[in-house]
Design a protein with these regions (language model features):
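Amphipathic terminal alpha-helices
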Residues: 287, 299-309, 316-332
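N-terminal Rossmann NAD(P)H-binding glycine-rich loop of SDR-like oxidoreductase domains
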Residues: 2-26
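Rossmann-fold cofactor-recognition segment
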Residues: 49-64
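Active-site Tyr-X1-5-Lys
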Residues: 137-140, 151-179
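Conserved Rossmann-fold NAD(P)-dependent oxidoreductase catalytic core, especially the SDR/UDP-sugar
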Residues: 107-154
C-alpha cells in the first residue's frame, strides 16, 4: 500500500516517515495488514534528501487541488496522514492564507481520499493532526476532554475545528475512514523558533540546553499542555491502526498531556544540567502581550482518558522527554 504524508518536510512529518519505514506495514482498507510499498511526502520545502528508495517527495502546497489528487492517486490502498498546516501565529496575522491552506487544503485532502475509495466497505484511512487550540472560551475550564465544547479563540483553532467536523461527516457518509488526533503542544522541537504562538514551549528547553538564553514571552506560572514528539508519532500510527468500530461518530481523540509551566521547565533543566554536566542557558523574561493574549485563550489542561482507554500511549515524564531530545538531537 501507499502512504501519503502532507507536511512531510517538517519535523513531525519526517519523523513519522522514518517510523513508518521501520514499522513496514499498516492496516489496509480491506482490514488486512499490508506492506508499505511507498511513501509520498508533500510539502512546500524539504530540508534534506531522502535516502530510502520507497520515499518520494512532491514539492507543492496542499491548496493546489490538482497536485493533491495526483499525489493521493486512485487506489483505495492508501493511508493519508494530514499534518500540513499554517501555524497559530501565522494564522492570526494572515487570515486569508490560513483559510486557503488549512481549510481549502484540508478539503483537497479529504476529497482526494473520497475519490480514491473503492467501496463503502473498503475506505482509505485519513489521520488528521488537529490541535488543542480547538478549545478555548472567555472562561477557561480546569480541563478539556473529548466531550468538551469547542470554542476556539484563534483562527488556527477555528480551522482545526472545522476540519475535525468535516472528518466526522465524511466518515459518517462513508466517504473515507477518518480520525483526528488532537495534539497538545509538542516538545522538544529541534532547530530554530517558528511562527507558532507556542514556539516558546520548545525554546525554553532547546535554547538553554544549547547554552543559549531563551526569551520567554509569557508568564512563568502559565500552565500549558505538552507532550513528547516520540509519543505523538506513536499515537498517530496507533490511531491509524484502531478498529473503526471503537471510534463511533466522534473521530477526534485528544492525546494525553502534561501540564507544564516555565517554572517546571527551569527545574527540569537544573536537574539535567547536574546529571549531564551541562552549562545551561537562562530563561529570560521577555513578556509579549500578543503571545500571552493568544495563550490566554487556550486550554491549560487536557483530559486524555479516552485516548488511554483506546490504547494510545501516554507521554513519559517531562524530564524523560527532554532526555529523549538530547539523545536524538544533541548535535542539532
Amino acid at each position: 500500500m501507499k502512504v501519503v504524508i502532507t507536511g512531510g518536510g517538517g519535523f513531525l512529518g519526517s519523523m513519522l516517515c522514518e517510523a513508518l519505514l521501520k514499522v513496514g506495514e499498516l492496516t489496509a482498507p480491506s482490514g488486512n495488514r499490508q506492506r508499505i510499498e511507498s511513501i509520498e511526502l508533500l510539502d512546500a520545502v524539504f530540508p534534506k534528501l531522502s535516502v530510502d528508495p520507497r520515499v518520494t517527495r512532491k514539492v507543492c502546497e496542499i491548496s493546489d487541488r490538482e497536485a493533491v489528487f495526483d499525489a493521493v492517486g486512485t487506489d483505495a490502498d492508501v493511508a493519508i496522514f494530514h499534518l500540513a498546516s499554517m501555524v497559530s501565529g501565522e494564522c492570526e496575522l494572515r487570515f486569508d492564507d490560513a483559510l486557503r491552506v488549512n481549510l481549502d487544503g484540508g478539503r483537497n485532502i479529504f476529497d482526494a481520499a473520497r475519490a480514491a475509495a473503492r467501496t463503502t466497505d473498503e475506505l482509505p484511512r485519513v489521520i488528521f493532526a488537529s490541535s488543542i487550540a480547538c478549545f478555548g472560551g472567555d472562561v477557561i475550564a480546569d480541563s478539556f476532554a473529548d466531550s468538551s465544547k469547542q470554542l476556539p479563540r484563534t483562527t488556527y483553532g477555528m480551522t482545526k475545528t472545522i476540519c475535525e467536523l468535516m472528518i466526522n461527516d465524511y466518515s459518517r457518509k462513508r466517504f473515507f475512514d477518518g480520525r483526528s488526533a488532537r495534539l497538545p503542544t509538542v516538545i522538544v522541537r529541534p532547530g530554530k523558533p517558528n511562527a507558532a504562538a507556542s514556539s516558546w514551549a520548545s525554546g525554553m528547553f532547546r535554547e538553554p540546553l544549547a547554552g543559549i538564553d531563551c526569551p520567554l514571552p509569557i508568564r512563568r506560572d502559565q500552565r500549558h499542555p505538552m507532550t513528547g514528539y516520540r509519543t505523538v508519532i506513536a499515537s498517530l500510527i496507533a490511531l491509524h491502526e484502531l478498529p473503526e468500530s471503537l471510534l463511533g461518530g466522534d473521530r477526534a481523540v485528544g492525546l494525553p498531556a502534561h501540564q507544564v509551566t516555565p517554572q517546571l521547565a527551569q527545574q527540569v533543566l537544573a536537574e539535567i544540567a547536574v546529571e549531564h554536566d551541562l552549562r545551561i542557558g537562562k530563561i529570560v523574561d521577555a513578556y509579549d502581550d500578543r503571545i500571552q493574549g493568544i495563550v490566554n485563550g487556550w486550554a491549560t489542561a487536557i483530559d486524555g482518558s479516552r485516548a488511554i482507554q483506546l490504547g494510545l500511549p501516554q507521554p513519559p515524564p517531562v524530564k524523560e522527554i527532554v532526555k529523549q531530545y538530547l539523545k536524538d538531537f544533541a548535535s542539532v
